[in-house]
Amino acid sequence: MFAIIKNGSKQFRVFEGQEIFVEKISLMEKSNYEFKEILAIGGKNNILGQPFVSGAKVQAQIIKHGRAKKIIVFKYKSKKKYRCKQGHRQNYTKLLITKIIA
């Protein structure tokens, strides 16, 4: 069985036992988190939400918080000696999907 969940502006297709990386969630490690915005449930009988599936939820456990690899943003204007270099590291949360309730 799988579910398609919405977290912020992103959608994830998840299975039980799967680990996913999402935008930072402000909860402690080893605590439980519950997704309530379920767009679809798949398996033996498929359920599509309009826009969400009523009564469905996905339970997950927070494994760890971290920061992604640094990306470099470099802007310049040719022939004008304008150079701007900036780095950015995005915060993330690693989740373990424990249960899908349809």
Curated annotation (Swiss-Prot):
Function: This protein binds to 23S rRNA in the presence of protein L20.
Any coiled-coil regions, as ranges: none
Keyword RNA-binding set for record: yes
The keyword rRNA-binding appears for this protein: yes
Subunit structure: Part of the 50S ribosomal subunit. Contacts protein L20.
Molecular function via GO: rRNA binding; structural constituent of ribosome
Keywords recorded for this protein, A-Z: Ribonucleoprotein, Ribosomal protein, RNA-binding, rRNA-binding
Protein name: Large ribosomal subunit protein bL21
Lineage: Bacteria, Bacillati, Mycoplasmatota, Mollicutes, Acholeplasmatales
NCBIfam families attached to this UniProt entry: L21
Single GO BP term: translation
InterPro entries named in the record: bL21-like (IPR028909), bL21-like_sf (IPR036164), Ribosomal_bL21 (IPR001787), Ribosomal_bL21_CS (IPR018258)
Cellular component, GO annotation: cytoplasm; ribonucleoprotein complex; ribosome
Similarity section: Belongs to the bacterial ribosomal protein bL21 family.
